[in-house]
Every structure is written in structure tokens, then in C-alpha cells.
Amino acid sequence: MSTVNVQIGLHELLNGSNAQIQLSVPQLVEKVLMRNEGKLTSTGAVSASTGKYTGRSPKDKFIVKEASVADKIAWGAVNQPISEEHFNKLYTKVLEYLKEKEELFVFKGFAGADRNYRLPIQVINEYAWHNLFVHQLFIRPTEEELTTHESEFTIVSAPNFKADPAVDGTNSEAFIMVSFEKRIVLIGGTEYAGEMKKSIFSIMNFLLPEQDILSMHCSANVGEEGDVALFFGLSGTGKTTLSADPNRKLIGDDEHGWSDNGVFNIEGGCYAKCVNLSHEKEPQIFDAITFGSVLENVIINDQTRIADYNDTTLTENTRAAYPMHAIDNIVLPSVAGHPNTIIFLTADASGVLPPISKLSKEQAMYHFLSGYTSKLAGTERGVTSPQATFSTCFGSPFLPLDASRYAEMLGEKIEKHDAKVFLVNTGWTGGEYGVGKRMNLGYTRAMIQAALSGELAKTETAKHDIFGLEVPLHVPGVPDEVLMPEQTWADKAAYKAKAIELANEFKANFKKFDSVSEDIINLGGPIA
């Protein structure tokens, strides 16, 4: 199937009598309720269920193996190839399926808040609530922008269309396929809305580095003086909590680009976890869930329509989607200068990493590539004790290119803009999980505040004898003994053994990076 034929098929779909283009939020909410796709909560949000798929489905994600990208993609378990033939046949079937629908919903908008680098996109949805979701998550065009909007990438989403693995070359009924040549994302068999968000992120992770822009899975905020901070970290490390600072404005909570102009948000909204959400713990998120927001897999009371964020009957991965402007303390447009401070967050359940340490450029690249945190008991079947987990660049499921490309760009930008990088352990202290205790949140906030203010740049440090990290000896508001992890353990020999064990896990994980420079390994990794 040629690109011309793809465009003809899209044109027919977009110009069909069933296509509802660029409906407003109230119109979409009405459609959701009339079509019985979801319910209205007491705060005016739409609550919808995603059926059996309550999270991303990484084994069902494919990139079409096309001549123009075959040598660029890091093929493997994350970036699974699928043939053009399989894609073309499935695409044709999905289009025929959607043409028969009574209504389709189309959103036109952008990915990328910096106008110089933004990607015009369109999303064709079978579900009205999915269209409301993308309306809130991506960047909404002005009326003037809409008149000249020409999409450069299209998501075609048909959650009720099920693939046949024997015929379609998929692993299950669900599929998320990206064709870079045809500029199409094809989604079916799953109702989980996050697949649309993360597909565009994966695309930006391919396109932006080609323009010399580092794409990053991180949150970002900016201080009153214009000083920018990035927060990288896997799930459960405190990224959302620690980047929501009343004294700093939020640039974005999840996906960013770093260009020669500075940092920009890729999105126009937030997709926040809301398990155990309360006004006391996360006031910004709690208050943002108003009319037009989307709650995913959250149980609501049949009578009062009040959301019960503590109920995980459907999944622990309950989510809220809302536009950036639903938060008070933000920067709009979501662009800022170059980062002054970069924070890597890790929840180390072995209790051996320092609560904060300063990183050299090589150490920053090493820990960026490592993307370390701990997987705790109970999060997955078969996990009975905490396990080290490594997610390359703090976002391996979304990286189409070789990881070293992103790390090299980070190193170059750190050096060029003199960004200070810190590794912050929000995990355990005084012993491993089950013996020690979780790091005091007040101490973590004080350490991050000291890093952001520049205080730590002039603080005396000591080199950690196993990890080679520079550990500050004094941080305002934090007891000195907390800063050196060995001092918090009653059994010093047990500390050393556990630290060496983790250092060896870092080294074993790093063996997969055969294309990185020796400097990163020799100057960035553990020294014992």
C-alpha cells in the first residue's frame, strides 16, 4: 500500500458523514453520556473503564519495518518489528471497520509546546471518551491555528476491533503499530487510553533527536528566577510529589524536549496516577479533576457519584487526565530556558545509596543509562523481596533509537549548559527494605531545595568508596548522619556487603550497552 493510498483512505474517513471533527469538551461529555461510554462524577469529570487492559500492553506494540527506518531503530523486545504487508492489511481492515460506525470523533492538535518543533497530529477515535482524553492530553489549537492545521501524524484508534494473531502477525487481539513512513499509529483491541499518549511520545523520541533535540521522560518546573529543574524517575520514586512545588511553576509532569532554545513540554495536559489520591496529599491533582477531566478505571459511588480513589477493584493503575490549565501554578505556554538542575530519583530498597549525591557528566550519563530503582514485593506476582530494576534512560518502553544516542545528547547538553546533576534516593535508610525505614520526605525536600538553590554546589563532599559518588557532608535541615548511608546502618559489614551486591547489579546491567564510550563505564560507574 502506497503512502498515497493511505492518505486517500484517511481522507475518506475524515470526510465521511459519521466524522465529528473537533468537538468541544461539553459536546464530547454529552456524547460520552449519550453513548453510555462513561459516567459523570460529582466534580463533573467523566469516569470510564478500559475493560481487561488496564495498563499499557508492551508485548502488543510494534514498529513497521520499513526501508527508511530499518537501520535506525533499536529492534528487540521493546521495538518489535512487523512487516509492511501485515500492517497494510490490518490498516485496511480497521478503516473498513470504522467507516461502518455511526459516529467517529476527530481531534486535531499538536505535540510539542515549542512552536519551532511541534508536531501537528490528528486522532481518529471510535470512542467519544478517548477523543475527550486526547483533547485534554495533547496541545489544543487556537481557532486560527485550526484553519491552517495539516497533520503530520495520525492515530487511528479502534478499541473494539480485535486482531487475529494467526492472520495479522500480532501477539494477541490487541495491537499498537507505528508506521514512520506512512505517519500512522494504528491501535486496536485495547481500550486503555494511555496507549495513544505513549505512542506519540515514542514518535517524538524518534523525530526530535534527528533535530538535535533530546526527548526526555521527566517532569520539569521553573523557579521565580527562571531557573529550570528536571526530575527523572521511575514509578514510585516521588517524581510527581517532588516536582509539585508551591514555590515553582510546573512546565510539565511527564514528557519534555530539550532544544537549543531550552526545555518544552511535549503535551498539553497531565495523566496522573490517582490511587489513594487525597486533597491533603496531592491538592494540585485533586483540584484539577473537574468538568471535562477523564478518570480511568476509578470506582465511583452509584448514588453520590463521588470517586473512591482508595478502591483498586479494577486496577492499581487508576488515572486522571486533565489539561495543563486545570492547575494554577503552571507556565503557559509550557516552555522555559535551559535546565540549571537535573534530579535523578531512585527508590533504593537495599538502603545503600546516599540520600543525595552530586554526579559528574560521566556519572550522569551512567545513571541515566542505568535508570535504576527497586521493584517492591507485592507489585508483581512472584516478587517476594525487593528486586533491582533498570529502565534505560528512565523510559525504556518508549525509546525507538539506541539508548547511547539519548545518553550522548544528555552529556553534551549538561556540559554545554553547565547543568548540575544529582542522584536522590527516596527509598530506604538505616537498612534494607523490611529493616530500615523509608527516607523522610521532609529531608528529601530539604535536599532538593538545597540542590535547586545552588547551596550544594559549594558544599564540601566525600567520595563514596563503593559507588564513587560525591556525597555532601552538610545539607541545611538534614542531620549530617543521614547523608552518609553507612552511618545509618547498625551493622556496617552488612551495609558494605549489600552495597557491593548492588554495585555488581549495576555492572551486570551495564554490559548490555556495548556502544557506549569507555569513559562512561570507567568514570561513571561503581568503583568497587
Curated annotation (Swiss-Prot):
Pfam families: PEPCK_ATP
One BP term from GO: gluconeogenesis
Binding site for ATP: K198, H217, G233, L234, S235, G236, T237, G238, K239, T240, T241, E282, R319, T444
MF terms in GO: ATP binding; metal ion binding; phosphoenolpyruvate carboxykinase (ATP) activity
Residues annotated to bind substrate: R56, Y192, K198, R319
Keyword Nucleotide-binding: yes
Localization in the cell: Cytoplasm
Pathway assigned in UniProt: Carbohydrate biosynthesis; gluconeogenesis
Domain of life from the UniProt record: Bacteria
PROSITE patterns named among the record's database cross-references: PEPCK_ATP
Record's keyword terms, sorted: ATP-binding, Cytoplasm, Decarboxylase, Gluconeogenesis, Lyase, Manganese, Metal-binding, Nucleotide-binding
Entries under InterPro entries matching the protein: PEP_carboxykinase_ATP, PEP_carboxykinase_C, PEP_carboxykinase_N, PEPCK_ATP_CS
Cofactor stoichiometry and binding remark: Binds 1 Mn(2+) ion per subunit.
One cellular component (GO) term of this entry: cytosol
UniProt-listed Enzyme Commission number(s): 4.1.1.49
Residue numbers binding Mn(2+): K198, H217, D254
Catalytic activities: oxaloacetate + ATP = phosphoenolpyruvate + ADP + CO2
Cofactor(s) named in the record: Mn(2+)
Principal cellular location given in the protein's record: cytoplasm
Family to which the UniProt record says this protein belongs: Belongs to the phosphoenolpyruvate carboxykinase (ATP) family.
Function per UniProt: Involved in the gluconeogenesis. Catalyzes the conversion of oxaloacetate (OAA) to phosphoenolpyruvate (PEP) through direct phosphoryl transfer between the nucleoside triphosphate and OAA.
Protein name per UniProt: Phosphoenolpyruvate carboxykinase (ATP)
Organism: Bacillus cereus (strain AH187)
